[in-house]
Amino acid sequence: MSGGGGASAGDVSRETRERIEALVSRETLSRLEAFAALILRWTARINLVSRKDAAPAEIWNRHILDSLQMLPLVPQGAFRAADLGSGGGLPGLVLAIARPEIGFTLIESDRRKAAFLQTAIAELKLNATVLPVRIEQARLEPSPLVTARALAALPVLFGYAAPLLAPGGVCLFLKGRGADAELTAAAEGWQMRAERFPSQTDAGAAILRISELRRAA
């Protein structure tokens, strides 16, 4: 990583730096730096991230690394994926930068955030499109991969994801400390295979890999 201020990631901890460099190439890192700079510039106007997370080091650790840690769980190959409630492009645009062969559809109903996403896609020349509608209004071909971060409780999230998920596909959801309780609640209405992977950025959080998702009989 380059040094210096701004959004270059020069202020992150050594541990965060090493984790990011282990996941992406130097070229990808350069594009992530450009993306982080866009987040900083736009956050002053439309609150893409909370104010306490608006410092460069926090953007890299709490948002970019948080999204990048999903990479080892992303299926291989070229396909289209759906990112639900994309907000500031986390994780959708981060994954689009790291896996350019995957075409991401970013579903975001907030017009200002959708405008940010469209700007980032154009400036960074990403393989992604923005669908500025509510998730339940989205009309897409089912995808092998559906992603989301800090969007809704799992019983609701499964309702959003199921119509957009292709047979044999997987969901990757970044969840906070209530993930286990949410899985228990979701099991009342859904059948699934759920795998839990510990977060690298929050000791109590997790990445959930959901497959074989269907409504309970």
UniProtKB/Swiss-Prot annotation:
It is found in: Cytoplasm. It comes from the Bacteria. Its main location: cytoplasm. S-adenosyl-L-methionine binds at residues 85, 90, 135-136, 149. Transmembrane segments: none annotated. Keywords: Cytoplasm, Methyltransferase, rRNA processing, S-adenosyl-L-methionine, Transferase. The keyword Chaperone does not apply. It is an enzyme of class 2 (transferase). GO terms for molecular function: rRNA (guanine-N7-)-methyltransferase activity. Pfam families: GidB. Its EC number is 2.1.1.170. It catalyses: guanosine(527) in 16S rRNA + S-adenosyl-L-methionine = N(7)-methylguanosine(527) in 16S rRNA + S-adenosyl-L-homocysteine. GO terms for cellular component: cytosol. HAMAP family: 16SrRNA_methyltr_G. Specifically methylates the N7 position of guanine in position 527 of 16S rRNA. Belongs to the methyltransferase superfamily. RNA methyltransferase RsmG family. This is Ribosomal RNA small subunit methyltransferase G. It comes from Acidiphilium cryptum (strain JF-5).
